[in-house]
Amino acid sequence: MKAIVTGGAGLIGSNVAKILNAKGVDDILVVDHLRGDPLKKRNLDSFAHAAYMERDEFRAAVRAGRIEPPRVLYHLGA
C-alpha cells in the first residue's frame, strides 16, 4: 500500500483520498467503521482505492503483522 487512510469514508478522510487520487495515487487502503451508514458508503464509492477494511478487522491485521507498512498514513478516524 502506498497510503492508508483511517476514517477514509468520512467527510475529511474521503476528501484526502480524492486529493491522493488527483495526484495519481489509487493504491489506498481505506479503514473505517461504516455501521450501515449510507452517506459514508457513498463517500467510499466516490474515489479510487485498492481495498477497504472495517476498523476492527484492521486492528487485528496490524496486531498479527499482516499489514504492509505504507509510505504514508493519514489517521483521520475517531
Predicted regions and their residues:
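N-terminal Rossmann-like NAD(P)+-binding domain of SDR-like oxidoreductases, especially those catalyzing
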Residues: M1-A78
